[in-house]
Amino acid sequence: MLSAAVLCGVLALSGCDKDKEGSAARGPSPVSVVKVTRHDVPADMTWVAKTESSRAVEIYSRVNGFLDARKYTEGGMVNAGDVLFLMDKKPFEVQLSEAQASLDSSLAAHEVAKRNLNRIRPLAKLKALSQTDLDQAIGDFQTTAAAVSNAKAQVENAKLNLSYCTITSPVTGYASSALQTDGTYINMSNAHLATVYTMSPMWVTFSMSENEEAKINQEVKEGILRRPENHDYEVQLELAGGEIYPITGRVTFSSPNFNPSTGTFELRASFENPNNQLRPQQYVRAIVKGATYVNAIVVPQIAVQEGSKGHFVWVVTKDNKAQFRPVEVGNWIGNDWLIKNGLEEGDKVVTEGMMLLASEAPVKIVQEVDQKPAADDKAKK
């Protein structure tokens, strides 16, 4: 038994010696590194957003009556002034005729009162008629004049109601489907007939959470982040499938109110849409540009690993040894990662070959590049 134990020990020692010899034979591990430099980095932020017509005009009937006909193509483009619906005009034409007849009667009565007053006034001066007769004539003249004014107003009202039978679009845009069918009696309860959506400019709305706003404000306070002058943020749209919309927009509205039900603040950007490529209610990605990370450190995402205690990188020391370095990360910036703490300018961060590294293990740099700013990269929250 003793001989067997001694033999096993000898074999184990022999194996250890062979491992050391193998490690020494391999020599320093080859690695590629990026040399850390500080520079200003675009702090682009991305949100899921939704397109919205800048002017969605609901088309209502202003009069009660039967809907005669829809005159537009549902879902098609209409121009300002185009006829959308026709109401039955006949009842309103009758009302106009009645109002005109009433006006004619009032004008005739007023003309009689006027002539009567013109006869009575000189006779009253000669004392041929009493003051009472004159007062009565003046009263008749004024009463009939008021009746004429009222009759004229009734005619104008009848003309207005008749004009309301022709329902036109106040804006240029795409028209929805008709909400009422031909022949339906329209009143206050079903007067909404359609909606016309203006296509340019197009609004894009998105929401920033309370935590996101607090984080941005804190980074600005600490001098890490710089907002654009006058908060003039540019916005780029990424459409479904990854296509970038060719026209950039601007943030034009930031809600002063916090929405407690969603825990967010609403923001809105405006985009010109000359070719009607954008349609209302599309989901897009809004890439908000203009803010800058000041004097920042970024490293390739591939260099950053995550362990049980957080994120870390491997750094090559001055004596060419691997060093384990915990880091505090910020946002993704394209293919890079913002490093908030843990690295300094001049550090050499391993980007290839880190899988074979151990702390204080010798390494050999086979490729070294300076970290360059990527001006057009997109930051992800």
Stretch-by-stretch model annotation:
Residues V235-Q236, A296-G334, V369-K381:
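Short beta-strand/loop micro-motif enriched in small hydrophobics and charged residues
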